[in-house]
From Swiss-Prot:
Effects seen without this gene: No visible phenotype; double yncF-yosS deletions (both encode dUTPases) are also viable.
GO function term, MF aspect, one: dUTP diphosphatase activity
Cofactor(s) in the UniProt record: Mg(2+)
Name of protein: Deoxyuridine 5'-triphosphate nucleotidohydrolase YncF
Pathway the protein acts in: Pyrimidine metabolism; dUMP biosynthesis; dUMP from dCTP (dUTP route): step 2/2
Record-level GO BP terms: dUMP biosynthetic process; dUTP catabolic process
Record organism: Bacillus subtilis (strain 168)
Domain notes: The uracil deoxyribose moiety interacts with the protein through Ile-81 and Tyr-85, which discriminate against the ribose form of the nucleotide.
A Pfam family the protein falls into: dUTPase
Residues given in the record as dUTP binding sites: 64, 76, 85, 93
Keywords, alphabetical: Hydrolase, Magnesium, Metal-binding, Nucleotide metabolism
Length: 144
């Protein structure tokens, strides 16, 4: 069964988005021209607001070409938009930090999102032992 998501566009000039068959991510585009100077931060408007189904959230990340094409990184590594952010004026943004002077044009694909189920309710139970030996971590796999 296909999930339906209600979407509102900032205005009629925004490119309509859709999911393509070749992947699990949906591209998002800049809603306006944005100039960012090196070492500057800006919220790039994406021109969409959505009403996610109950129990789901959106994960927003840069496209693989975002840094190469625009010289920006997403400041929070991954954006998480939960089901409560669904008002008529709750438009999505891409938090961009520029590592060089750059121009992002209206319609440029700069990030992507996917819909994920929210984490189930959990209870953290404090214990003295976890039942296994220390395994290393921090790059230790396969070094012995």
């Amino acid at each position: 069964m296909t999930m339906q998501i209600k979407i509102k566009y900032l205005d009629e000039t925004q490119t309509r988005i859709s999911k393509i068959e070749q992947g699990d991510w949906i591209d998002l585009r800049a809603a306006e021209d944005v100039t960012i100077k090196k070492d500057e931060f800006k919220l790039v408007p994406l021109g969409v607001a959505m009403e996610l189904p109950e129990g789901y959230e959106a994960h927003v990340v840069p496209r693989s070409s975002t840094y190469k094409n625009f010289g920006v990184i997403q400041t929070n590594s991954m954006g998480v938009i939960d089901e409560s952010y669904k008002g008529d004026n709750d438009f999505w943004f891409f938090p961009a930090y520029a590592l060089r002077d750059t121009e992002i044009k209206k319609g440029d694909r700069i990030c992507q999102f996917r819909i994920m189920k929210k984490m189930p309710a959990v209870e953290l139970v404090e214990v003295e032992h976890l039942g296994n030996e220390d395994r290393g971590g921090l790059g230790s796999t396969g070094t012995k």
